[in-house]
């Protein structure tokens, strides 16, 4: 049976928990003919999501942010939208964090969600304006050349990590490739071999050696906005004993003589905790970011001789879009 087929159906007619007519316990289906689907003009229920109700399976459309399970129509809405039995062909599972328009047949209210059986999903892009993004995926040639591993994703302390200065592709080291894009590494003891490559992300430090990174010049970030953030994924390293390296990260914004330092919350993990990425977010409210701003992500423990190792990926400056 395909969408658009004209069919003969034998089964038991009943209603679902939303009191809408349905057919369940189907005994026999016969395809009488094929055909194209002529969908009616959908009713947009986005602006009335909290008040909408219907005793029929009307054809509707709604726009919102998909969070992986439901659609948020607005920050003030009491109800969200659940897409019922969405076929994989719609690709909805890949649209987490996107603004999407879902069109389909109304399937009733099951508080706190309005239910829709989708016939179409339109991707309207990510729910944010991105002013800066670095995911280090462009380091793939160096990752492949060195055979480095994924310590965080595999929770494997023995995953290979090679110094950026020791990996060369087409005559360029990974260290130089990063700095050619405007980044600048900082490190103690004049030892630049303590920044390492993992599979398309960075590892900083070893026992007694510490390091950090200065971002390239970033332009176009609006001033006087309350909802612009700098965010990144990070993780501390676990020692063979199970102890988590006591890393204290900071982000420093410097505009001439003006300096703002933001502390990143500590991981607070117990010994033996499985390695995993943690998202750090820094509000840029009241902080100027332009092409002359120096932004440093680093650790505070520069004078200690202990292990304070950490991983970094997915740096972003962004602003959410209001629906």
Descriptions of predicted regions:
Residues 1-127:
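OB-fold nucleic-acid-binding modules
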Residues 57-59, 233, 274-280:
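Trp-centered recognition loops
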Residues 244-255:
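Short, surface-exposed beta-strand/strand-loop-strand elements in extracellular ectodomains
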